[in-house]
């Protein structure tokens, strides 16, 4: 209901007594959606723990936490790039944006958004190596080669419209090396992978928020690299031990991609109130 009402709230400004009132209404409805999701999941799991009959997969706490993790992960993944274009083109004075770079229009910022999604692809390709039944030595070689092959695809695609500079390629290559080190340290352990890349993601967002220039820009872009492996890790940890309820639990997890529709507008409203850079702090808390 709150999602429906939030869409219905988007009416022409002249039909409302105050545009400010409309913005507050949208923010409240979005917060209600967010709180409702968390409350319903916790309530269902709490009730199931007392009397599991009829609750199916929801009686397992790892699934409940996994549902919330998928919700927030997808929300963060979508949010970083959804508002990145606005961050790069918003002029705070003298043709400079909030991270201290020259203001970029949509065409100029498109390659950075593409690079963010490319980072997601790089991480997914690299993470998939663990699914193959190959020797450990070959796996280690592929862990190093695969991300750069994927990056080559990203570079080639951008070359047709807005090519990356040698400097940008070099910086992102160094970030890929950090990701590779993370994979080596985790040693195919889903819990370790999630812990390492969650920490790296938080560090990247902090650098983006409090840094400036290309350092801040590429810190935000690195969010794609570090978010990329979260889905399979959360999924596998959440359905462990569900037995006959594995299929049902998987369905619940997929439903929680709803976070990608709730968290981005919430950050957008926070950006309107506190500023775009400050609004990215919400991603760290999530």
Language-model features: locations:
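Helix-to-loop junctions at the C-terminal end of transmembrane segments
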Residues: 123-137, 181-189
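Loop-to-transmembrane helix entry
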Residues: 95-116, 144, 165-168, 247-251
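Intracellular juxtamembrane helix-capping segments at the cytosolic ends
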Residues: 229-243
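C-terminal transmembrane helical hairpin of 12-TM major facilitator-type secondary transporters
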Residues: 142-230
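Extracytoplasmic gate region of multi-pass secondary transporters
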Residues: 6-11, 61-113
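Conserved small/polar residues in nucleotide/adenosyl-binding loops
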Residues: 1-5, 284-286
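A late C-terminal transmembrane helix in Major Facilitator Superfamily
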Residues: 244-271
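A membrane-interface helix-boundary motif in multi-pass transporters
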Residues: 9-29, 269-284
């Amino acid at each position: 209901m709150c999602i429906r009402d939030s869409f219905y709230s988007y009416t022409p400004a002249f039909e409302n007594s105050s545009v400010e009132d409309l913005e507050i209404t949208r923010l409240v409805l979005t917060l209600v959606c967010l709180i409702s999701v968390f409350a319903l999941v916790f309530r269902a799991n709490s009730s199931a723990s007392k009397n599991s009959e009829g609750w199916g997969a929801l009686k397992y706490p790892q699934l409940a936490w996994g549902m919330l993790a998928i919700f927030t992960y997808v929300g963060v993944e979508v949010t970083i790039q959804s508002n990145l274009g606005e961050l790069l083109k918003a002029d705070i004075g003298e043709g400079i944006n909030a991270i201290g770079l020259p203001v970029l229009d949509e065409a100029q910022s498109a390659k950075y958004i593409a690079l963010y999604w490319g980072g997601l692809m790089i991480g997914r390709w690299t993470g998939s190596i663990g699914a193959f039944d190959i020797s450990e030595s070959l796996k280690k070689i592929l862990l190093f080669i695969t991300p750069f092959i994927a990056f080559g695809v990203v570079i080639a695609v951008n070359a047709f419209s807005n090519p990356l500079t040698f400097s940008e390629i070099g910086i992102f290559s160094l970030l890929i090396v950090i990701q590779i080190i993370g994979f080596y340290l985790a040693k195919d352990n889903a819990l370790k992978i999630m812990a390492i890349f969650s920490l790296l993601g938080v560090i990247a967002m902090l650098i983006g928020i409090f840094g400036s220039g290309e350092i801040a820009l590429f810190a935000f872009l690195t969010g794609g690299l570090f978010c990329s492996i979260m889905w399979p890790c959360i999924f596998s940890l959440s359905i462990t031990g569900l037995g006959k309820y594995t299929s049902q639990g998987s369905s619940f997890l997929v439903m929680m991609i709803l976070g990608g529709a709730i968290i981005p507008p919430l950050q957008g409203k926070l950006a309107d109130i506190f500023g775009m850079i400050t609004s990215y702090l919400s991603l760290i808390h999530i």
